UniProtKB/Swiss-Prot annotation:
Keywords: Arginine metabolism, Cytoplasm, Transferase. This is Ornithine carbamoyltransferase. The gene is arcB. It catalyses: carbamoyl phosphate + L-ornithine = L-citrulline + phosphate + H(+). Reversibly catalyzes the transfer of the carbamoyl group from carbamoyl phosphate (CP) to the N(epsilon) atom of ornithine (ORN) to produce L-citrulline. Pathway: Amino-acid degradation; L-arginine degradation via ADI pathway; carbamoyl phosphate from L-arginine: step 2/2. Pfam families: OTCace, OTCace_N. L-ornithine binds at residues 172, 236, 240-241. It is found in: Cytoplasm. Its EC number is 2.1.3.3. GO terms for biological process: arginine biosynthetic process via ornithine; arginine catabolic process to ornithine; citrulline biosynthetic process.
Amino acid sequence: MTKDFRENVFQGRSVLAEKDFTAEELEYLIDFGLHLKTLKKNHIPHRYLEGKNIALLFEKSSTRTRSAFTTASIDLGAHPEYLGQNDIQLGKKESTSDTAKVLGSMFDGIEFRGFKQSDAEILARDSGVPVWNGLTDEWHPTQMLADFMTVKENFGKLKGLTLTFMGDGRNNVANSLLVTGAILGVNIHIVAPKELFPTKETQDLAKGFAEKSGAKLLVTDDLAEGMRGSNVVYTDVWVSMGESNWEERVNLLKPYQVNMEALKMTGTPDDELIFMHCLPAFHNVETQYGQDIKEKYGITEMEVTDEVFTSKYARQFEEAENRMHSIKAMMAATLGNLFIPRA
């Protein structure tokens, strides 16, 4: 039988949450990202989206996500158009559904970085074009593609590795790591104070995927138990965008700082251990935030020490670069009319 070369399991699909994809699909996007990174490094054109127009919607400020989507679009031959919080009125002056219909008639794809997951879902439902979640309060799928691409780049595999997230176990990055790792067969440890454990709903969702993949999941407030056997130690800011309860959060999370003592708890050989952070990081006092934190709480480092952040284990800048390559893979796969048959 002749294959239909128009077949593409991703074409026209939105990327709203990791749970919507199989392990095989996620691994394809990760591997495609690695391939596109090689093309980029060797100055080989890959303009799969020539002539396409991409809307970049940002309710929340961004450095890496905006830069990654912009450069990825241009490399793929598309034109990105940035619409910031002063340009879009989701649910304020115009309903999200109406905005979706207007943008969908003008653009070929939409990136959305905002607060409500429901807004991303409405945009995908009513725009008629692929919508890519650049971050919501619940999920961060584009970060996950970059993260697990970075892990595979360093270890040559994913399945069977152990990734430990230490910090606020309720935030979107922790949610996404727990679920994505469970889908991919990566053991995930969440090390956090009990008050900041992932919700039961998120844990149950991850457990369902882990039963199929064989991933081992652990949620604990015990540092020694949680760090043991880790290949990847990951952290994020202690207080997320828009939150104001700094003092309570800092006091809760002080024992959960990623420092050299914590890395030693892994018992993992140096060449089998890396540190990751989705950035920005409060690892010194070279920012206004850092100065404010020092004045209010008497600390010069928060979620990670400068020693770890600048150590041989650190991969956060490689991880940040991979945002571009993995986003490029996602955009090309869902909008580029490529031949990607079902496995």
